[in-house]
Amino acid sequence: MALVLAAAGAVTVVQFRDAAHEADPDGALRGLTDDITADLVRELVTILPIVLVIAAVAAYLLSRAALRPVDRIRAAAQTLTTTPHPDTDAPLPVPPTDDEIAWLATTLNTMLTRLQRALAHEQQFVADASHELRTPLALLTTELELRCAGPDPPTS
C-alpha cells in the first residue's frame, strides 16, 4: 500500500509493507524501486525516440545554416570555372563573419587576383613575342617579294 502526500509543492511517497513482503524486511522498498524503474523505462522508451528525431532535425538545420557561406563560395567558384569568359573581377563572396570560412574566401580571392595578374603578364609576353617574331618575318617576306618581282637593283 502506498500513500502519496502533497504539501507546499513537495510530493512525499510513503510505502507500507504488505503481508506478501513480511518475510522480506526490504520488500516494501524493493517493490517501490521496481515500480519507479519500470515507470522510468516506460517514459524513456516513449520520449527518447521523439527527442532523438528533434535533435537530428535541429542538427541538420544547424549544419545547413552553418555551411551556407561555403555553398555560396562553391557556387561562385563553379561559375568562374564553367563560364567561357568569366567576370574575373567579381570576387568570391566573403561572409561578414570573422571566422575560418571568411579567411578562406579572402585567401581564395587573393589567389584569384594573383592568377589574373600572372595571366595578364603571360598574355603581354605572348603579344610582345608575337610582335618581335612578326617584324623580322615581315622584312624577309618583303625582301623576297621584291627579289621575285624583278631584277636585282644595281649596286653601287
From Swiss-Prot:
Keywords: Cell membrane, Kinase, Membrane, Phosphoprotein, Transferase, Transmembrane, Transmembrane helix, Two-component regulatory system
Domain Histidine kinase: 128-156
Localisation: Cell membrane
Chain ranges on the Cytoplasmic side, renumbered to this chain: 64-156
Xref: InterPro entries: HAMP_dom, HisK_dim/P_sf, TCS_sensor_his_kinase
Ranges annotated as spanning the membrane: 43-63
PROSITE patterns recorded: HAMP (PS50885)
Topology feature Extracellular, residues: 1-42
SMART domains cross-referenced by the UniProt entry: HAMP
Domain spans labelled HAMP: 64-120
Subunit structure: Homodimer. Each monomer interacts with HK1 and the receiver domain of TcrA.
Other comment: HK1 and HK2 are merged into a single protein with a distinct N-terminal sequence in strain CDC 1551 / Oshkosh.
Stated name of the protein: Sensor histidine kinase component HK2
Organism expressing this protein natively: Mycobacterium tuberculosis (strain ATCC 25618 / H37Rv)
Top-level taxonomy: Bacteria, Bacillati, Actinomycetota, Actinomycetes, Mycobacteriales
